[in-house]
């Protein structure tokens, strides 16, 4: 993570890392999803995420598909390789510190044309959330829960998808409700554009949400959340037999690096 990238992450609370996945890796991941998409679910209307905002309304819910790491081979391989991808590890080492761990199992989030948006959320504002935070001390950033999103399709201007309030991870006041509903102050809100193969990294402390999806092609994002090695948001899970040394390092339960926790340098 170079000095420019550190500055941009500190400034905005997120960073787009380009071309982490090769076109071949993207194609294999999409092929695996096509093979299993009938196992996914569309979020039902009674579980709507739009917060009652007409600006975020959609005629359908977003799609969600889990269990990717446990699919049969070769379909599982593209996603297992994402866990400790060499193009991602150096960024997480800087953002979370060496010895970081995966806290939430990765899953596919997809949006077809017309899918609803998601009201703004995040842990910025008054008070301190010990799970989701951003602190800068002694020349280093310290983050709680952090999201890495592998993009499997392009997100172009106007398509919808992920939106953030840049810099809100350092805000000291609550986000106004009309802004959370995307009804006011849109000039301070940014749609995050990216290409298939890019990874979007953001701290859960930054205020973020999604806009309804308007593109003819689907949005496909592989989401997982990482945290410092000694922290946990969700309960730990059994170590899978298939994990290699790199994958085991990020699947370890939470404990401090001084207790010989395995770390990845790259």
Q: Model-predicted segments: where are they?
A:
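Histidine-centered catalytic micro-motifs
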Residues: 118-124, 165, 207-210, 224
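Short, glycine/small-residue-enriched coil/turn segments at secondary-structure junctions
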Residues: 85, 136-143
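Double-stranded beta-helix
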Residues: 7, 141-211, 231, 246-249
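Short, P/G- and charge-enriched loop/turn segments at secondary-structure junctions
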Residues: 131-138, 187-188
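Non-heme Fe(II)-dependent double-stranded beta-helix
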Residues: 1-11, 18-134, 255
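A structural signal for short, well-ordered beta-strand segments
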Residues: 104-107, 148-150, 222-226
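Phosphate-binding beta-loop-alpha motif at adenosine-nucleotide cofactor sites
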Residues: 16-17, 203
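Non-heme Fe(II)/2-oxoglutarate
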Residues: 39-52, 175-179, 196-199, 206-266
